[in-house]
Design a protein with these regions (language model features):
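Conserved phosphate- and dinucleotide-binding cores of soluble alpha/beta proteins
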Residues: 1-145
Length: 145
């Protein structure tokens, strides 16, 4: 075992071409990921080294089930309740529904890939309803009451 000063060092991670796979509590249609807080306030676990690896990996992948609480809550949401990893660092999101490769995609294309490939079928229409409320040809964060 190496100390975290070496194993989590950004230069080492980049040089080795690490493919990082981490778990998410929820991911939003923009590609932002919450990996530490339930409902945005209740800490589930610490971020650990996932920030170092997500930011510096050759490919950063996040996995989660598409639903939580026995299907009562979608893990793919319009906006994460707490952001640990921004859309700029997340390359791929995987659920049991499928894979969304976000590399090189515009915000609109990212939302399409995440909703179509990762969201549970019971929640896809709700997510598309949210997207329809956004400005045409752009995907901006909109706070709906």
């Amino acid at each position: 075992m190496r100390p975290s000063e070496i194993s989590n060092n950004p230069e080492v991670i980049r040089r080795l071409g690490v493919i990082s796979i981490n778990t998410a509590i929820e991911a939003d249609i923009y590609g932002n990921v919450n990996s530490t807080h339930i409902s945005g306030t209740k800490m589930m676990n610490g971020i650990g080294g996932s920030g170092d690896f997500t930011r510096n990996a050759y490919i950063s992948i996040f996995t989660c089930p598409s639903v939580a609480k026995e299907g009562k809550i979608s893990a793919i949401v319009p906006m994460v309740s707490h952001e640990d990893h921004s859309e700029h660092d997340v390359n791929i999101i995987i659920t049991e529904q499928g894979v969304a490769d976000l590399r090189g995609k515009s915000p609109v294309e990212r939302a399409q890939a995440i909703i179509e490939n990762c969201a549970h079928p019971d929640y896809k229409n709700i997510l598309w309803d949210y997207v329809k409320c956004l400005p045409k040809d752009r995907l901006l964060i909109v706070f709906l009451p």
